[in-house]
Amino acid sequence: MTNGVPFLKKSIAIILAFVVLTSGITSCNSFKKLNTQQRGAIIGAGAGGALGAVIGQKNPALYAIAGSVIGGVGGAVIGRYMDKQAEKLKKDLGNLADVERVEEGIKITMKSGVLFDFNSSKVNSTVNDNLIKFAETLKQYPDTEILVAGHTDNVGTEQYNMTLSQQRANAVANVLKTNSVTRNRLTVLGYGEKNPLADNTAEPGREQNRRVEFAIVANDKLKKQATKEVVAKN
């Protein structure tokens, strides 16, 4: 498991990444949630740089997914792999999380209010069964890498929230590791209060901002397999 280090190795040329990101990704509803500057950063970075920008950007899960896209028929092969996994994850997590298929990846959002007590980084025992099922499905689909990103509201100091978000992300990742998700598949980051989804001035917004997000993307092995399938059929 790495802390603060981008985890996806890119194997696609910059020019191909530019074509994919300007044609496929920009049509995705979730990608449209990124503002103009953020979209430009991904497109301008190409395949090699998109994940490098995750640490300092809003919507890190979407950045991770956007940076992993290979596009074309190979991307469609990966998409089918993700479709099956996403359907299983929806059953595993139930009301605990929102599971969304985004391009060639999966974005998952879990509310911290369900995972943790207030100001705590200890995972509630009530969600253990769901997280164990989550880990089991990740084991069944081993050719992926997972970004785990913790977020808080703005109650408390910025440093406290940064620490809490990292501790919470670590706590969820530890449940996955305990249940045999290998540590080299995980990148765990805390973002503190820096990436709010909603207005922090009222409790409904703060509740939405307290969350743990996941991005599930293809690893190099799956990308190579997808490319080989395309070549074999042609």
Predicted regions and their residues:
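Periplasmic peptidoglycan-binding/anchoring modules of Gram-negative envelope and division proteins
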Residues: 94, 116-150, 177, 207, ...
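Amphipathic, membrane-active segments
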Residues: 82-110, 114
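Extracytoplasmic/secreted proteins, especially bacterial periplasmic and envelope-associated proteins
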Residues: 41-49, 65, 69, 84, ...
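Periplasmic OmpA-like peptidoglycan-binding domain that tethers envelope proteins to the cell wall
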Residues: 151-225
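C-terminal motif of bacterial Sec signal peptides marking the signal peptidase cleavage site
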Residues: 23-27
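Sec-dependent N-terminal signal peptides
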Residues: 9-18
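N-terminal secretory signal peptides that target proteins for export/translocation
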Residues: 1-9
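Short, low-complexity, glycine-enriched hydrophobic/amphipathic alpha-helices that associate
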Residues: 29-90
